[in-house]
From Swiss-Prot:
Record function comment: Forms part of the ribosomal stalk which helps the ribosome interact with GTP-bound translation factors.
Name of the protein described by the UniProt record: Large ribosomal subunit protein uL11
UniProt subunit comment: Part of the ribosomal stalk of the 50S ribosomal subunit. Interacts with L10 and the large rRNA to form the base of the stalk. L10 forms an elongated spine to which L12 dimers bind in a sequential fashion forming a multimeric L10(L12)X complex.
Post-translational modification, as annotated: One or more lysine residues are methylated.
Species: Staphylococcus epidermidis (strain ATCC 35984 / DSM 28319 / BCRC 17069 / CCUG 31568 / BM 3577 / RP62A)
């Protein structure tokens, strides 16, 4: 018989840098999960993606065991990395902070494709371009 899921915890953690301090510790402590076990497993699974923020969905079962799924980094994080900026524009319609090429957008769309609600690569690119526009990043 399959184990019953008691709780699902969603977090965004820097790759390879999970530790028992907030926000990880309190979120998992309330669910009764072995925090150090999760941190070690997460860090081992994400060490090659250092510098990126990784969304993770942790399923906690009634016997306090857990499984987790790592997702692709959020589109704004990938766009900031591609554009080489620290943060997006405070006034995206007035102030443009950077420029990315169509090829960079295509690469990000291919990376995000599994998590996006898009039928094909072109639709995924349009989603990423919209995110870029809302951050004050120009697409050429």
């Amino acid at each position: 018989m399959a184990k019953k899921v008691e709780k699902v915890v969603k977090l965004q953690i820097p790759a390879g840098k999970a530790n028992p301090a907030p926000p990880v510790g309190p979120a998992l402590g309330q669910a009764g999960v072995n925090i150090m076990g999760f941190c070690k497993e997460f860090n081992a699974r994400t060490q090659e993606q250092a510098g990126l923020i990784i969304p993770v969905e942790i399923s906690v079962y009634e016997d306090r065991s857990f499984t987790f799924i790592t997702k692709t980094p959020p589109a704004p994080v990938l766009l900031k990395k591609a554009a080489g900026v620290e943060k997006g524009s405070g006034e995206p319609n007035k102030t443009k902070v950077a420029t990315v090429t169509k090829d960079q957008v295509r690469e990000i769309a291919q990376t995000k494709m599994q998590d996006l609600n898009a039928a094909d690569e072109e639709a995924a690119m349009r989603i990423i371009e919209g995110t870029a526009r809302s951050m004050g990043i120009t697409v050429q």
